Amino acid sequence: MSGYILCQTKRAKLPYFIENISTNVYSIEELCYYLYHNLYLIDQTIMNEGLCSWIQEELELPALAAKLRSKISKFASAEDIVYPVFKEINYLTYEELNVRLQKMNEETPAMREKQKADALMENEMYVHAIQVYQNLLEREDLEEIREGMTEKVYHNLGCAYSYLFQMEKATEYFRKAY
């Protein structure tokens, strides 16, 4: 996947607000871009009835909204929920999505949580990232999962606190990292 994607569908007058990164999306293409680049952040706060209503009313895609409603009500897997959105505009093939999701599913729950926190950091959601990193540090099996994981979490906590200009806490975590 390279280059650019030309918007082929209607642009919404009212955006859909993605709460966990405080971002508005105005089109199905923007939604696909967000989902593709933030797979670790996909949860019930995004894939819910509000999204289905927005897709139906603002984007005027009632068939897609109906598909998503049925998947969400059955508590389907992320793959089953996300794929119809990608398929609507041929953003990804099933195989491309499956490769990304399979890689994600092979990771341990702790590693997925770290990836989630890292994604929050990339989106400048430092307070949420700090919460996820703190929860990771409470796990007793963190070092067993991957050597050096604890130090990386401490380092990332230091970075998060430094972005929030809490230099004393940042220094504390940087020291723990090394």
Task: State each model region's role.
Residues M1-R112:
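Long, contiguous interaction/recruitment modules in multidomain scaffold/adaptor proteins
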Residues R100-M104, E138-G148:
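Flexible helix-coil transition and linker loops at the boundaries of alpha-helical arrays
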